[in-house]
Amino acid sequence: MSLAPSDVIFAPASGVGGAISLLRLSGAGVARVIGALAGSLPAPRRASLRSFRDGRRGIIDRGLLLWFPGPASVTGEDYAEFHLHGGRAVRAAITAALLDLGARPAEPGEFSRRAFLNSRLDLLEAEGIADLIDAETEAQRQLALDLAGGAMSRAVAAWREALIGLMAQLAALIDFADEDLPAEVEAAMLASMARLRDEIVAAIGAGLAAERLREGVEIVVLGAPNAGKSTLVNALAGEEVAIVSDIPGTTRDAIGVRLDLGGVPVRLVDTAGLRRSDDAIEAEGVRRAEAHARRADLLILCGAAPDFVVPDAPADVPALRIATKADLGGAVPAAMLAVSARTGAGLADLLAALRARVEALVERGAGPALPRPRQIACLRDVAAALDRALAIDVPELRAEEMQAAAVALARLTGTIGVEDVLDQVFSSFCIGK
């Protein structure tokens, strides 16, 4: 995005056709636009009832005007809101008038981008806003709200302050290398550095769990043909998302459905029955099922009555073993959960077991976390630099590694070196954000 920051931009922040239409404006010429459309500037931060008019159309509408002079505004520049009636004709007329006055429609995320460029929010807060817009479940909302509200930004600021203090101590040790300083001084500095490194490592672990929460936990259902996988998926989803048939090999491709398990987003994936097949399409379905199993966060291994044999699964992926079609009889092994998707028996117990497993997968401890791969990568860079600094005995080289850690922290909040990230972050926003 390469746009002039001085342009007056505008965008609707509400849908068309409602009772009220909210229009946002930002830029150095907002006061001029207000003067042309609504007369004199109102008192800042107070709602004022005005008639909005232009020379060609006369009165366009009557509504509320709010004026926020920069830099004390949401974007850091002059900003206004028009609260008008929500009809399409009103929206079209006010848009035409704004275009006549030289304003232009905002690009996706441009309001938030200007707020970032004017230091009204940092990159972590901007990413939190994007995640809040996309949040589907309560747990995702809480995670995104912590990020958007600056909780992680404050944690990063504390890490930065601690790192700067350590760098100052190291600089003093280098400057006074000829002095007979007590060995305890350097030992205390290294102990503090190790504690900071441990905090960063803990944050990486929390971030990996939070990433799973942000992206959604993938649960893959595996079993032989006719093991009741599709019927089970339909029962858990509460709708018919997969075709059910007594004919083996009916499911030939992975079919996913989104679920909300206790506030955690889940993608439940039905797969082709695992067996050798001369049918090229079915064989490809089996290959894809095995690939999904290797990438899964959790497996449901289905074994149907009467023998309840479950398939082999990747050893590094946790699994629940389910005895499907339990209503048909047979001795269910003690390690398996008996379920009948046809009668509903055992489904509540299965959902409870899934919820417990899913909550354990996204457990990140108390406090906020960094859920995006970019953020976790920055933390890993910080931890790696601190590890190298702790392992080096040469003070000048140790200082270089600590500087590398500081640079990685700065990239985390967008202070430096993130131009390639900005377009990706803000382009995911809606127009009015």
Curated annotation (Swiss-Prot):
Cofactor remark from the record: Binds 1 potassium ion per subunit.
UniProt KW keywords: Cytoplasm, GTP-binding, Hydrolase, Magnesium, Metal-binding, Nucleotide-binding, Potassium, tRNA processing
Known EC number: 3.6.-.-
Record CDD domains: trmE, TrmE_N
Main location: cytoplasm
Chain residues that bind GTP: 226-231, 245-251, 270-273, 340-342
Domain TrmE-type G: 216-359
Binding site for Mg(2+): S230, T251
Coiled-coil blocks: none
PANTHER family: TRNA MODIFICATION GTPASE GTPBP3, TRNA MODIFICATION GTPASE GTPBP3, MITOCHONDRIAL
Function: Exhibits a very high intrinsic GTPase hydrolysis rate. Involved in the addition of a carboxymethylaminomethyl (cmnm) group at the wobble position (U34) of certain tRNAs, forming tRNA-cmnm(5)s(2)U34.
Protein name stated in the entry: tRNA modification GTPase MnmE
Lineage start: Bacteria, Pseudomonadati, Pseudomonadota, Alphaproteobacteria, Acetobacterales
